[in-house]
């Protein structure tokens, strides 16, 4: 394994031992990626251990932050389907085709029987099925609902489908422990704003924003004062237009 990048970090022997221990637990590639991105941003040949440590910690914390919101959003849509359609009986054979017939009065059929969780009984309810299903299957069922009903979540149905698909895809980055900061393929701030938009209440949105503000203050003011160029490119700070987009 290539460890040459470790030589780019200004650190003591004790700090190096700590860093290698974290790398063993979390993965060298993740730390190496963050280290190289910091050097690229600052246009310097090395990075201080304290800076690498706090930015890596921020990346991990944001991963947990997104994961928490993902679970909340998923629960919101599962609860809606469960409360309104949870008692619908379905069988193992062509289960989703049956769901689509029942939810659309036979107007649309969608056969995805391969998604059926074999742990479920041959006959089950939609509520039990959704509990055992992935978010992908949850959205397949949700998008069968009439447009009028989906307007509860967003007046623009095409936008709702596009945004929830983005949120579903974001799970892959979070679940597989990929670096979120400095990632050109993953617009972290855009994704946080999008998830906040689907928090169910004003209070839940404000609570998450407060958590983000406290995290920024704790890491970048109290734990390690970052150079401005780094702080501006790393810290997620919401502005007026984003508050409006979230609905605040």
Model-derived segments and spans:
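Extended intrinsically disordered or low-complexity regions, especially N/C-terminal cytosolic tails and loops
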Residues: 1-162, 166, 181-248
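Histidine-centered active-site/metal-ligand motif
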Residues: 176
């Amino acid at each position: 394994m290539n460890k040459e990048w470790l030589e780019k970090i200004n650190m003591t022997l004790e700090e190096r031992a700590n860093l290698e221990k974290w790398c063993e637990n979390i993965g060298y590639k993740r730390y190496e990626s963050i280290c190289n991105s910091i050097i690229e941003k600052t246009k310097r040949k090395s990075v201080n251990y304290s800076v690498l440590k706090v930015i890596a910690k921020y990346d991990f914390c944001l991963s947990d932050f997104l994961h928490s919101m993902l679970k909340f959003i998923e629960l919101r849509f599962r609860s809606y389907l469960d409360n309104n359609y949870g008692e619908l009986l379905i069988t193992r054979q062509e289960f989703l085709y049956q769901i689509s017939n029942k939810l659309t009065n036979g107007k649309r059929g969608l056969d995805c029987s391969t998604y059926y969780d074999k742990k479920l009984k041959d006959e089950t309810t939609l509520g039990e099925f959704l509990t055992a299903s992935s978010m992908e299957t949850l959205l397949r069922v949700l998008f069968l609902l009439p447009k009028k009903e989906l307007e509860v979540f967003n007046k623009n149905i095409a936008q709702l489908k596009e945004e929830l698909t983005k949120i579903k895809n974001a799970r892959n980055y979070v679940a597989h422990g990929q670096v979120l900061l400095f990632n050109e393929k993953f617009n972290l701030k855009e994704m946080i704003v999008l998830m906040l938009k689907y928090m169910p209440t004003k209070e839940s949105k404000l609570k998450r924003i407060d958590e983000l503000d406290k995290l920024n203050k704790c890491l970048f003011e109290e734990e390690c004062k970052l150079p401005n160029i780094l702080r501006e490119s790393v810290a997620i700070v919401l502005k007026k237009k984003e508050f409006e987009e979230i609905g605040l």
